[in-house]
Amino acid sequence: MKFRKANPADLDSIEKIYDDIHAAEENGSQTTGWIRGVYPTRETARDSILRGDMFVLEDGEILGSAVINQILVDVYSGAPWKFDTESVCVLHTLVIAPQAAGRGYGRAFVAFYEQWAKEHDLPELRIDTNARNAAARALYRKLGYKEMAVVPTTFNGIPGVDLVLLEKNLNAFRPA
């Protein structure tokens, strides 16, 4: 398993993961709260690749992707964060191919994100997820992230989202 910055040649693989997740959402086998054609889309991935902040997980093939940057979502401004934003790093749109679910790839991607943030001296970590995404919420809590707020919003064009805002500080967190 390896992680690397995504490049334009990865776009089809990332889009396929998005499509597979949308199909799983539509058939009821996965709950993300995402909507096909609204978010995430090929354009979502393309824009992130062009910005240089999209990363992929490869294990024989591309099985996951995520955006890692310092871009704060608008709804973050009203949350009761414990840590300031000068040294913040945000994980956006973490996806693992549905056929690879349950094999530890999500946990590994979060570990990669934390290591990347540490190497870039960005110890304040933030993640958001749809409140309907119970699997993501459970994973993030298990990895030491604290739910700071649930904010009703229209998120990336999807109305009626209860966005869960999570935080972790690498300097403050000590595993049990």
Spans of features found by a protein language model:
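Hydrophobic adenine-recognition pocket in adenosine-nucleotide-binding enzymes
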Residues: 6, 94-96, 129
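Conserved acyl-donor/pantetheine-binding loop and adjacent beta-alpha core of acyl/acetyltransferases
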Residues: 67-93, 101, 154-159
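A short beta-loop-alpha structural element at the N-terminal edge
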Residues: 2-16
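Conserved GNAT acetyl-CoA-binding A-motif
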Residues: 110, 117-128
